[in-house]
Swiss-Prot record:
Protein name as it appears in the record: Desiccation-related protein clone PCC6-19
InterPro entries in the cross-refs: Dehydrin, Dehydrin_CS
Compositionally biased intervals (Polar residues): 118-135
One Pfam family named in its UniProt record: Dehydrin
Species name: Craterostigma plantagineum (Blue gem)
Induction: By desiccation (leaves) and by abscisic acid (ABA) (leaves and callus).
Keyword DNA damage on entry: no
DNA damage recorded as keyword: no
GO cellular component: cytosol
Biased composition (Low complexity): 83-92
Region of interest (Disordered), ranges: 1-155
Length: 155
């Protein structure tokens, strides 16, 4: 929503979305989902999960966004947030009574279906009476397991 008078009398006071714009040499805007808002100063802003825009001294864009540096270069360290929305624990046992932080690879493995990668081979000992086919000690494929369960004879 533009104000009356337009750019002719003092410039535009809102952006294209109707948000107020600070006027002056040190006006900066920090965007993002979790805030930022309008700030004025010479040191720029930090946008959380969005992007920050810089003035004289630059900014640090944190999280998933990006920052743009001004004439003075970026100040401060970046705030890092993970993009994971997993409900699983972020640490696991290291086998010696302590705990260690899971890496990205471990978290991704946890989300994939089909087990956790630890398989053990099972063997049968002794003798057993068989009807029809002999027992095999090989792993069966998915199709073999399905065919076994279908009525109407063995395929």
């Amino acid at each position: 929503m533009a104000q009356f008078g337009g750019e002719k009398y003092g410039g535009r006071h809102t952006d294209e979305y109707g948000n107020p714009i600070q006027q002056g040499a040190g006006a900066h805007r920090g965007g993002g989902i979790m805030g930022g808002g309008q700030q004025a100063g010479q040191h720029g802003t930090t946008g959380v999960l969005g992007h920050g825009t810089a003035g004289q001294h630059g900014t640090t864009g944190g999280g998933l966004g990006h920052g743009t540096a001004g004439t003075g270069g970026a100040l401060g360290g970046q705030h890092r947030r993970s993009g994971s929305s997993s409900s699983s624990s972020s640490s696991e046992s290291d086998g010696e009574g302590g705990r260690r932080k899971k890496g990205m690879k471990d978290k991704m493995k946890e989300k994939l279906p089909g087990g956790h990668g630890t398989t053990t081979d099972q063997q049968q000992y002794g003798t057993a009476a068989t009807h029809g086919q002999a027992q095999q000690h090989e792993k069966k494929g998915i199709m073999d397991k399905i065919k076994e369960k279908l009525p109407g004879g063995q395929h």
